[in-house]
Design a protein with these regions (language model features):
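Exposed loop/turn and edge beta-strand positions of beta-sandwich/beta-sheet ligand-binding modules
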Residues: 56, 68, 86, 164-166, ...
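Active-site-proximal cap/loop segments of hydrolase catalytic domains
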Residues: 121-314
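Glycine-rich His-Gly loop
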Residues: 18, 91-95, 174, 254-257
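Short secondary-structure junction motifs
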Residues: 10, 23, 83-85, 165, ...
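Non-catalytic accessory segments flanking enzyme active sites
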Residues: 1-81, 98, 107-110, 114-115, ...
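Short substrate-entry loop that stabilizes the transition state in hydrolases
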Residues: 81-87, 91-130
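Conserved hydrophobic/aromatic pocket- or pore-lining residues that grip, position, or stack substrates
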Residues: 26, 62, 72, 90, ...
């Protein structure tokens, strides 16, 4: 870049970009004197780890219970038959003003997309996709809005013919594990399999374990009777009903998680197993909140989730 405004690169800029189907790419963007785009010249890209030919990424909107339009991304084969049979993985987070934006994952591409699976990312309230107001709309007693948004996306996928409940799985970790824990306990009829990773699940005691006290502003204070009542409405451990039918569930956690205590996953898995439900639980003895200490362990944890979901959704 010519900082003096003269020379061949005076009206040019460097741009780094990525999406679900494109590895991170550095490009030179050339502009005319009025700032209008002349050309985008890709210069260097990270390696591709799967064949994206014939795959497309698109954005749709679902309507939540209160009428809010909720955006979500779908990555699928361009020639996908809309007959409701595609194994579909729905991912979400919905908390702490964190935005889920498009990004490239070689593991996802090789393990899921290349096999004909559909991948969906829901940009539900609680996240930061539309700024602070989008986050604040799902704080504390309004947490139900995040879960209603996610369920609305699940229903919209079925309505579009992309998938059906028996072929639709969900995955989320940490706050996203609380999300998928609520999908498991509040909306079991919408899903064929659920993956709950390093989750919060006991919202009555979360503030007493590890970093839990630092999240009171997000979820609510269990020591306040009014807020505890609200917390119990989205506490999967307390919402579990032994007499209800649930989809197969995989819990994953880490013994050395220093943020969300592994006891959350342990106690709901134990309660469900005692009730005779279809539960798989895996606890890595290394790694922190990410669940793995090495790349090999991370690959193993990812493979566990993809294998579990593929085996139950196809």
């Amino acid at each position: 870049m010519d900082r003096d405004g003269e020379g061949d690169l005076a009206d040019a800029l460097w741009m780094t970009s990525t999406d679900y189907l494109t590895p991170t790419t550095l490009s030179l963007v050339r502009l005319d004197g009025d700032g209008e785009l002349l050309a985008v010249e890709p210069l260097k890209a990270a390696p591709a780890f799967f064949d994206a030919e014939g795959l497309v990424a698109e954005q749709h909107f679902a309507t939540s219970d209160d009428g809010t339009r909720v955006p979500y991304f779908v990555v699928r084969r361009e020639d996908l038959a809309l007959d409701g049979t595609a194994p579909t993985l729905l991912y979400g987070y919905g908390g702490f003003e964190i935005s889920l934006t498009p990004g490239y994952s070689g593991g996802l591409g090789r393990a899921w997309l290349s096999r004909g699976g559909v991948y969906v990312v829901a940009n539900i309230r609680g996240g930061g996709e539309y700024g602070p107001a989008w986050h604040q709309a799902a704080l504390k007693g309004n947490r139900h809005r995040a879960y209603e948004d996610f369920a609305a996306v699940a229903r919209d996928l079925v309505a579009r013919g992309i998938t059906s409940p028996q072929h639709l799985g969900v995955q989320g970790g940490s706050n996203g594990g609380l999300l998928t824990g609520n999908m498991l306990t509040q909306y079991p009829e919408l899903f064929g399999a659920v993956v709950v990773q390093v989750p919060l699940l006991d919202m009555e005691r979360y503030h007493l374990l590890l970093a839990g006290a630092s999240w009171v502003a997000e979820y609510g204070d269990p020591e306040d009777p009014a807020e505890l009542e609200q917390l119990l409405r989205f506490s999967p451990y307390h919402l579990f009903d032994a007499g209800r039918t649930y989809p197969p569930v995989l819990f994953t956690t880490s013994t050395k998680d220093d943020r969300v205590h592994p006891g959350h996953a342990r106690k709901l898995a134990a309660r469900m197993l005692e009730a005779g439900k279809d539960v798989t639980s895996y606890e890595n003895i290394e790694g922190g909140h990410g669940g793995a200490a090495t790349n090999a362990q991370a690959a193993h944890m990812a493979a566990l989730a993809y294998t579990f979901l593929w085996g139950r959704l196809t």
